[in-house]
Amino acid sequence: MAFPRTLAILAAAAALVVACSHGGTPTGSSTTSGASPATPVAVPVPRSCAEPAGIPALLSPRDKLAQLLVVGVRDAADAQAVVTNYHVGGILIGSDTDLTIFDGALAEIVAGGGPLPLAVSVDEEGGRVSRLRSLIGGTGPSARELAQTRTVQQVRDLARDRGRQMRKLGITIDFAPVVDVTDAPDDTVIGDRSFGSDPATVTAYAGAYAQGLRDAGVLPVLKHFPGHGRGSGDSHNGGVTTPPLDDLVGDDLVPYRTLVTQAPVGVMVGHLQVPGLTGSEPASLSKAAVNLLRTGTGYGAPPFDGPVFSDDLSGMAAISDRFGVSEAVLRTLQAGADIALWVTTKEVPAVLDRLEQALRAGELPMSAVDRSVVRVATMKGPNPGCGR
């Protein structure tokens, strides 16, 4: 696949190239208040040059689990500590992140990371969800405005240009585009973040935006499966119920039938209760919801074997009102997600302890963890310097 090769080449240009046999300990394990403990608790491991299928055999159980975590960081010290101490698979640049991390520290952290390349992710949709506005030329138009005022090709070009700016900063994953279908007012939870109320329009414009990001070497992540557009509220504030699955199939799920085939691409599963699918559980913690995405059976899509992300598991009341972070992370991995996402680092050691306990107890099958590690390794591509 050409995309991981492009990603690896760009990463090599952005960071210090580390030979595959290098296993040195990254410097600077100090942390700001509330971050991971300063004392390293993970043994430094060499960067791996193995093919994705061979990666699980090279990692300890704890390092496998760590690769399935993406956590928000406050600043460079916070990022350095969680990568050095716990070998997490990725970090999230969020609304509270000190953007001076891009002044050189991020490249050093990436160069001194764990066994696989470090994923660096962001919510950069344009419009009102723009974490990097001060670094990439402002917020840009909202998705709704783009669909109303630009052609599909113009949207692809815009996403490519913004993606290139993100990639120069070191971003490898963008949690965009929004694929939700809605005509709700602009200022509602999805609102103008959506390309519109017509599934065909959303498919065309979201597909163009995703392709522009791919053109730039950034992985697009479609969200919020199986569809937040007609949900009963805001999952940041509490539980959200969508229309029944049969209703979603003819509307909200339509874009996914096409867009999951346009690889490489990821999908984020939302905290949405879907009558006829998830029962009282949110989709992000539901085996039935992830199985719907994986198999395509039930909504007319082909199987999907790309990376599946949870939505934020710590800062959204739809989850945090019911579960602590460790339990939520376990449940999303049990449901079949590959990557658990949340917005702070302080929970990482407890999460890894809980996941290791679940492995030993048979609550989380090692075979499922290994499959997710292979997907994560495929998503990331080879380490810089591996010659692939």
Curated annotation (Swiss-Prot):
InterPro entries named in the record: Glyco_hydro_3_N, Glyco_hydro_3_N_sf, Glycoside_hydrolase_SF, NagZ_Beta-hexosaminidase
Catalytic reactions of this protein: Hydrolysis of terminal non-reducing N-acetyl-D-hexosamine residues in N-acetyl-beta-D-hexosaminides
Residues linked to a lipid group, N-palmitoyl cysteine type: C20
Residues that hold substrate according to the record: D123, R131, R193, K223, H224
Lipidation (S-diacylglycerol cysteine): C20
Described function: Plays a role in peptidoglycan recycling by cleaving the terminal beta-1,4-linked N-acetylglucosamine (GlcNAc) from peptidoglycan fragments. Acts as a regulator for GlcNAc-MurNAc levels by cleaving disaccharides and allowing the breakdown of MurNAc.
Family: Belongs to the glycosyl hydrolase 3 family.
Protein name, per record: Beta-hexosaminidase LpqI
Organism: Mycobacterium tuberculosis (strain ATCC 25618 / H37Rv)
Lineage start: Bacteria, Bacillati, Actinomycetota, Actinomycetes, Mycobacteriales
Gene behind this protein: lpqI
